């Protein structure tokens, strides 16, 4: 959420910045709300002065033994007016807040303008894209030959865009997540968290998923008890970022406790209505997928550098797996609702002959902290200040699995296991096709 003073006092500047995200700031609606709020606030102030003066008059009348009936009636009417106007201003403030919650974060000046993938800037490439002298198979074909990917059973059990992994493919998938977590804990200094997969509405507002992305989420509803008509509503997490960020809700830390670095491996659930064609093929875009998520909570002066660091941490996973990738600086129209600057890491998929996003690394600045009231004190000033938050996929486990299957396939009918994963798979070096 944007700072209220910034929004109202520098409206044109904010509107110009948000236009880069293709967001139109409705000045008339916002100004109307604000003008009405000021009018009501002045009425409250006048009524409070009138009530104070009336109280003095009543005290004086009591001392002079004057009949208080008329004065007490005036006092009751004043209180009723105050209650009514305060109720109106609460409703108005709620409307203003709801509008504020629909406004995205301001993009950094340094990121490029644009709304298409072609407007993103390639920062660098890492690794060698191999040339194969045999016919390449995609990850679904490879998975079926190995007997490790079962789409039909998943469709029968649940529906489309779900998967079942089994055998050595499931083993490889598990090894990947364990490897990633270990690297981030042991080498990068993160603390591991085990998190709820169901979250409440406050958490979704706090992280910025609501109100915009309601229709992209899986919502549940359960009866509190057999004898009760009350229902409890929760939502399945779209990313571990949501519960990780909300750990800091209504928390104030000392600056010496910063940075706070958190990591979690969770399934993620996204409805994401719409069609993606071949881009949704297989494990590329499913309703349920696993991801290792990184979140950093830092001093405002450190978030620019922290974005480079958290991105490097995600890159390190791809480098250790020896998977070719490229690093993209996203244009203003492509960054997320909450982000002010984002790097995407795109891994090379040889069967598709293209790069595919495997990690998104973003600086959120104080956008989430203002929603969740996450603050710090420096020990000098009594007043606390808002923290900055950052997040990154470290990385998407399913897409890493896809990249390994396709990049490590061999002509003799095997999948070579990356060297760093072999210790996580009891020393295995290859996965063989079922018919071998």
Swiss-Prot record:
One of its GO terms (cellular component) is cytoplasm. Its EC number is 6.1.1.11. L-serine binds at residues 239-241, 293, 393. GO terms for biological process: selenocysteine biosynthetic process; seryl-tRNA aminoacylation. It catalyses: tRNA(Ser) + L-serine + ATP = L-seryl-tRNA(Ser) + AMP + diphosphate + H(+); tRNA(Sec) + L-serine + ATP = L-seryl-tRNA(Sec) + AMP + diphosphate + H(+). The keyword Cytoplasm applies. Gene3D superfamilies: Bira Bifunctional Protein, Domain 2, Serine-tRNA synthetase, tRNA binding domain. GO terms for molecular function: ATP binding; serine-tRNA ligase activity. Keywords: Aminoacyl-tRNA synthetase, ATP-binding, Cytoplasm, Ligase, Nucleotide-binding, Protein biosynthesis. PROSITE patterns: AA_TRNA_LIGASE_II (PS50862). The keyword tRNA processing does not apply. HAMAP family: Ser_tRNA_synth_type1. Homodimer. The tRNA molecule binds across the dimer. NCBIfam families: serS. Consists of two distinct domains, a catalytic core and a N-terminal extension that is involved in tRNA binding. PANTHER family: SERINE--TRNA LIGASE, SERYL-TRNA SYNTHETASE. This is Serine--tRNA ligase. It comes from Blochmanniella floridana. The gene is serS.
